[in-house]
């Protein structure tokens, strides 16, 4: 599902809100989440999951085109850990 599809689906389900209002709310929520992670803080949405930053240590990588070694710097990357309820709902698909 893309962001546009999410906005469309929510606007349909929440008929009291216009598509523009839903779009604005989604964009603001995503901006707040990005700002929180940018500040090094963790986001927890109970039942859904948590977002945090994980540190990736410096390492030697390879250029896939040439095969030459490339030194990659250490960096923080976003990480999502699903919550118990979300895991159970997804697991139910496999049962």
From Swiss-Prot:
Please give the superkingdom of this protein's source: Bacteria
Q: Which UniProt keywords apply?
A: DNA recombination, DNA-binding, Transcription, Transcription regulation, Translation regulation
Determine if Iron is one of this entry's keywords: no
Q: Name one Pfam family in it.
A: Bac_DNA_binding
Write down the SUPFAM superfamilies for this protein, in alphabetical order: IHF-like DNA-binding proteins
Q: Name one GO cellular component term.
A: chromosome
Does the entry feature the keyword Glycoprotein, yes or no? no
Report any one BP term from Gene Ontology: regulation of DNA-templated transcription
Please provide, alphabetically and separated by semicolons, the GO molecular function terms listed in this UniProt record.
Answer: DNA binding; structural constituent of chromatin
For this protein, the record's NCBIfam families field holds: hip, PRK00199.1
Biological role stated in the UniProt entry: This protein is one of the two subunits of integration host factor, a specific DNA-binding protein that functions in genetic recombination as well as in transcriptional and translational control.
- Describe the family membership recorded for this protein in Swiss-Prot or TrEMBL: Belongs to the bacterial histone-like protein family.
Q: How does it assemble?
A: Heterodimer of an alpha and a beta chain.
What is the designated name of this protein? Integration host factor subunit beta
Organism (species): Shewanella loihica (strain ATCC BAA-1088 / PV-4)
Q: What is the lineage of its organism?
A: Bacteria, Pseudomonadati, Pseudomonadota, Gammaproteobacteria, Alteromonadales
Record gene name? ihfB
């Amino acid at each position: 599902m893309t962001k546009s599809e999410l906005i469309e689906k929510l606007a349909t389900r929440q008929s009291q809100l216009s598509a523009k209002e839903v779009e604005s709310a989604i964009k603001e929520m995503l901006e707040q989440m990005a700002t929180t992670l940018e500040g090094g803080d963790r986001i927890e949405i109970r039942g859904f999951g948590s977002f945090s930053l994980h540190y990736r240590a410096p390492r030697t990588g390879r250029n896939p085109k040439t095969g030459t070694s490339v030194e990659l710097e250490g960096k923080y990357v976003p990480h999502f850990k699903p919550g118990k309820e979300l895991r159970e709902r997804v697991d139910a698909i496999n049962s």
